[in-house]
Amino acid sequence: MTFPAGWMWLALCRRHRLYVILRPGPYICAEMDFGGLPSWLLNRPGLALRCNNPLFLQKVAAYYKQLFDRLRPYLGENGGNIIAVQVENEYGSYGNDKDYLRAVAQIYRDNGVNEF
């Protein structure tokens, strides 16, 4: 989903009383270039992707802060139509860093997202 088209799509789903399961990443899917991650992450010394790397998690937290601030009205607990938010995607076939998954889930919680 691209934005602002994504916001229009969420509003349309809400208007028609359709529920949404959101997949905001950080890794979205193999069908998108680099899984939806920005390629400039590769140029950051010391940054490792999709693991419990503090530099990566810092970038993830900044992304989620911006995203979830805008999504908050659409969350189910706020009367919206987002009923679930996926933590990562296809991670079991890539890695098994449970600390990373817990850290991403905590970033969700820190931003008021509990639908996962």
Model-predicted segments: where are they?
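Low-complexity, compositionally biased segments
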Residues: 8, 36, 91-93
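Aromatic-lined substrate-binding rim segments of carbohydrate-active enzymes
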Residues: 1-33, 41, 104-110, 114
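Aromatic- and acidic-residue-enriched carbohydrate-binding clefts of CAZyme catalytic domains
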Residues: 2, 30-55, 84
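General "foldedness" signal
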Residues: 27, 32-36, 81, 96-99
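Generic structural signal for short, flexible, solvent-exposed coil/loop and linker residues
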Residues: 9, 29-30, 45, 49, ...
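Active-site neighborhood of glycoside hydrolase catalytic domains
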Residues: 55-116
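Aromatic-enriched hydrophobic runs in primary sequence
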Residues: 12-27, 38, 61, 69, ...
